Regions:
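Conserved N-terminal substructure of TIR/SEFIR domains
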Residues: 2, 46, 57-123, 207-221
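Short hydrophobic alpha-helical membrane-entry/anchor segments
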Residues: 32-39, 49-58
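C-terminal interaction surface of TIR/SEFIR-family domains
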Residues: 63-67, 163-221
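A short acidic (Asp/Glu
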Residues: 79-80, 136-139, 164-166
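Residues at the C-termini of beta-strands that transition into short coil/loop
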Residues: 94-97, 156, 193
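Conserved beta-strand-loop-alpha-helix hinge of the TIR/SEFIR fold
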Residues: 118-146, 150-161
């Protein structure tokens, strides 16, 4: 596999706030037509801005298609717990036998499988165990996601209890292994969350939808 090569991050955008502003302006115009004067402008602007913000909230209620990137051998049982959270639409789980058969087919087969399963996903969620940051296919998925303009985020899952092995040692941030030409790390623009050690599952369950929405809204690629 070739070495990581990332496109430079974009500057922060005000696009989402601009949409609300446009809604407010449109509301002011309509309000002034219906009720000429300052009162109509103010009322219409407030109504339009509120509608723009509420439309964004309604959109966020739908399940967002995501791709889970993780170290299969070590963390598949922990990842399954995340899959069971109903608010997220993840890529279909692969059984150990299917994964081994895919790997035996060669690197090209694995890459094609990743490319096809990632194609229509809006966000790539890297679920980080002890050795995730060193895995070649995780690195490929991160690089591809960034260069394809998809949202990215990481979640440490070492405190989720695997039925076989319990919890595990916290792994490194995989986004630290990517460096832009400027010298900045990918981790400087991609969020990585470390859930509570006391209630890791509840923390992830309560927040993952919001984390994903935030990653999509604020992505820099």
């Amino acid at each position: 596999m070739r070495g990581p090569k990332l496109g430079a991050p974009k500057q922060d955008t005000t696009y989402k706030n601009g949409k609300i502003l446009l809604s407010a302006i449109a509301g002011s115009i309509v309000g002034n037509i219906l009720t000429p004067g300052i009162g109509g402008l103010i009322f219409g602007g407030i109504a339009g801005g509120t509608l723009g913000a509420s439309n964004k909230k309604v959109t966020n209620m739908a399940k967002i298609p995501v791709f889970y990137s993780f170290h299969f051998n070590n963390d598949v049982m922990r990842v399954q717990q995340v899959r069971n959270i109903g608010s997220i639409e993840g890529n279909p789980p692969t059984t150990p036998n299917e994964w081994e058969r895919l790997k035996r087919s060669g690197d090209r087969a694995v890459q094609n499988w990743i490319d096809q399963n990632m194609k229509y996903k809006r966000c790539i969620v890297v679920l980080i165990g002890t050795e995730t940051a060193t895995r070649p296919w995780v690195k490929y998925e991160i690089e591809k996601a960034w260069n394809d303009g998809k949202a990215l985020l990481g979640i440490h899952i070492h405190n989720l209890r695997c039925p076989r092995n319990g919890t595990c040692r916290k792994g490194a941030n995989p986004f630290d292994t990517f460096t832009f030409d400027s010298g900045a790390k990918l981790s400087s623009v991609v969020p990585c969350y470390d859930p509570s050690s006391v209630s890791a599952y509840a923390d992830i369950s309560n927040n993952i939808a919001g984390w994903i929405n935030s990653a999509i809204d604020n992505k820099r690629n």
